[in-house]
Regions:
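Structure-specific DNA junction-binding interface
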Residues: 1-70
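C-terminal extensions
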Residues: 67-95, 109-156
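Small-residue hinge/turn detector
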Residues: 100-101
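Conserved hydrophobic/aromatic packing and binding residues within compact polymer-binding modules
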Residues: 104-107
Length: 156
């Protein structure tokens, strides 16, 4: 079957796999890659690095990651509600592009009053731009190996 490149939904792991003969997958299709009864995927070739993505896969990656982030909104909201300092001078929230000290304090002060319910609530109360887009940017930085700390991805 055809060769496909996949993004895991939990740790944003990049995989290469073969598709069942006669099946055609499109970008954004969700497929099961677990041990038993895979319908679309016949064989997982293995994990790949960011630099091994095809140019077509790279073009789609941001949109695919953002969709995963939106689908896992409760998980990411929990991150904003519970994130702690990583070092005495650096808070996990500051590792997200676009969030510096000012936004970090707004997020922390607001979550102390009441935890955030969803991205919209976070965006309104902490007055930050699109949380899903900021998280997506962070995930892409981690995937491409640009960052020392990993908040959302597993090392290749």
């Amino acid at each position: 079957g055809a060769l496909v490149q996949l993004v895991g939904e939990e740790f944003f792991t990049l995989l290469e796999a073969t598709v069942r003969e006669g099946l055609i997958l499109k970008p954004y299709d969700r497929v099961y890659v677990g041990k038993d009864s895979r319908h679309e995927i016949t064989y997982i070739i293995g994990r790949i690095g960011f630099d091994e993505l095809t140019s077509a896969a790279r073009v789609e990656l941001q949109g695919v990651v953002e969709r995963i982030v939106l689908n896992r909104e409760p998980w990411f909201i929990n991150f904003f509600n519970t994130a702690q300092a990583i070092t005495p001078r650096m808070h996990a929230l500051e590792l997200i592009p676009g969030i510096g000290k000012k936004y970090m304090w707004q997020i922390l002060n607001q979550r102390e009053k009441t935890p955030y319910k969803n991205f919209e609530d976070l965006q309104k109360r902490a007055d930050i731009p699109s949380p899903a887009r900021l998280i997506t940017k962070r995930i892409l930085e981690e995937m491409s190996g640009e960052s020392k700390y990993r908040l959302f991805t597993r090392a290749p």
